[in-house]
């Protein structure tokens, strides 16, 4: 099949008016075109390395849950329509989440299972990006279980302790928690508890080393996330 008289966005250059031939879903030939440009553009599929969208698809409003298969199917259609061909679903664990709530061990594991179970029927190459907060020591065991099961494609580490890094402004963080469904009192209490229980640097580095060794052992790429650059 030929796509002719289109603008082609390639890895090393742009062909303003070209033609592309595909065979069995694979690009077989790219040439210049002498025809009248159609105004259409062909570009490589986008890769989304960090998508927060899966959690909102499942729970668009606090305590309003969509069925897993419906949410995953809807997300897949939206990503494909936007030109995203590989999407890393960002999932994480929260120490403040109760059983079954967003970012609890149960909820996050269910998200991963839903993606893995529906993978054959989806348009987009869906992968799992686990974001590990170095302050949450108890989550290491859960992460290890997912790595052993081969359910994780990327791990990033971060420190979301309030008062530094991304959450330097406490009032902004309180507002963010309130938009997620918590009252101001609940948000302030939760944030103060996190600040009071902040881990010493030695413990943070120990958690980082343990997670690094797990990723190395299972051949999973590792990255940093929300670094403090000031």
Locations of the language-model features?
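N-terminal metal-binding scaffold of metallo-dependent hydrolase/deaminase domains
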Residues: 1-33
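Divalent metal-coordination and catalytic microenvironments
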Residues: 6, 20, 25, 39, ...
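Active-site-proximal flexible loops/turns
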Residues: 12, 55-59, 136-138
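Short, intrinsically disordered, charge-balanced linker/junction segments flanking boundaries
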Residues: 26-28, 226-230
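Short amphipathic alpha-helices and their capping/turn segments at secondary-structure boundaries
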Residues: 32-40, 71-81, 140-155
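Metal-associated gating/positioning segment near the N- to mid-region
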Residues: 40-110
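Mobile, glycine- and charge-enriched loop segments
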Residues: 50-52, 59, 214, 219-221, ...
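Metal-coordinating catalytic core of metallo-dependent amide/deamination hydrolases
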Residues: 94-97, 101-227
